[in-house]
Amino acid sequence: MSWLSLTFRIGSDYVDLVGDRLLERGALSVDVHDAGEGTSQEQPLFGEPGAPLDQFWQQAEVTVLLEENANIDEIIQGVAEVIGLPALPEYQLAQVMEQDWVRLTQAQFEPIRISSRLWVVPSWHEPPDPAAISLRLDPGLAFGTGSHPTTRLCLTWLDQFLQPGDSVLDYGCGSGILAIAALKFGADRVTGMDIDPNAITASLDNARNNFCDPDRLLFTTVLPPLVEDDRASAEWAPVTIVVANILANPLIMLAPVLMKALQPGGRIVLSGILETQADEVLQVYSEWFDMHIAAKEQGWVLLAGQKSGGGFA
């Protein structure tokens, strides 16, 4: 079995109209992305939370998946009519062959070496180093497989600085990778928090796959004092380490919350921050922490700091 793939470029103003016309004509799927992707002309479509939303690309590349017997001439003419041209000036047509898509997807994910003693290993691979710590993690609904620089930065920091007996809050836990790693590195208790229920589901699945002790690892969508469960509330005593790998704007807004979650003298680790955003985040957190840039990778930074002594006002 095979399909046809039709690719062409149009102005972004026509994307919705063209997409509707293609689906009406029997398209199986319509994929739209920035025609300048990967070049100096690439334009962001969405900013991070708190950023302006009026960011759009000017040229869109559209890829349509069609049945093998689709009437290509009729479909191309329909697109040309929508954009007001007698014909599409340029397009590419290709055949898409049936493949083992699961195996093809799995082949894209190899074990990732984070440090001399830590690997992130998909479930369909054998651990490359039986003597090392292997986090069993499959790509899924939540962010965090170890492939992104910000995740690697956080894992490397935890590997170097977490001490047995530490207590950890992973704020914005995603897949649970940082929380699970903290437990494997010897943390006494770990709490992973995320506002996305899908992230909690993924984290719980990954915790089970890594044989984590449920009495030492808690995942929740709500921060105390909203959590009324006694066990959850007990786990939310101030911790010795807070790690948050999210984005710069949410981190800025969350600074007072994360400050209260730490014991005096506790350490905070922040990532998901571009080098160009580091100074702004440092300025905000310096009100409560002795902050510095701890590491950089591919334009991303890891900020780390220690909380001053005193109360939790």
Curated annotation (Swiss-Prot):
Protein family: Belongs to the methyltransferase superfamily. PrmA family.
Taxonomic lineage of the native organism: Bacteria, Pseudomonadati, Pseudomonadota, Betaproteobacteria, Nitrosomonadales
Cross-referenced CDD domains: AdoMet_MTases (cd02440)
MF-aspect GO terms: protein-lysine N-methyltransferase activity
Keywords: Cytoplasm, Methyltransferase, S-adenosyl-L-methionine, Transferase
Major localisation: cytoplasm
Cellular-component GO terms for this entry: cytosol
Biological process annotations from GO: methylation
Binding site for S-adenosyl-L-methionine: 151, 172, 194, 245
Top-rank taxon: Bacteria
Name of protein: Ribosomal protein L11 methyltransferase
Subcellular location(s) per record: Cytoplasm
Keyword Transferase recorded: yes
Known function: Methylates ribosomal protein L11.
TM helices/strands, residue ranges: none
Transferase recorded as keyword: yes
Protein species of origin: Nitrosomonas europaea (strain ATCC 19718 / CIP 103999 / KCTC 2705 / NBRC 14298)
Reactions accelerated catalytically: L-lysyl-[protein] + 3 S-adenosyl-L-methionine = N(6),N(6),N(6)-trimethyl-L-lysyl-[protein] + 3 S-adenosyl-L-homocysteine + 3 H(+)
EC number of the protein: 2.1.1.-
Top enzyme category: transferase
HAMAP family hit by this protein: Methyltr_PrmA
Classification via InterPro entries: Ribosomal_L11_MeTrfase_PrmA (IPR050078), Ribosomal_PrmA_MeTrfase (IPR004498), SAM-dependent_MTases_sf (IPR029063)
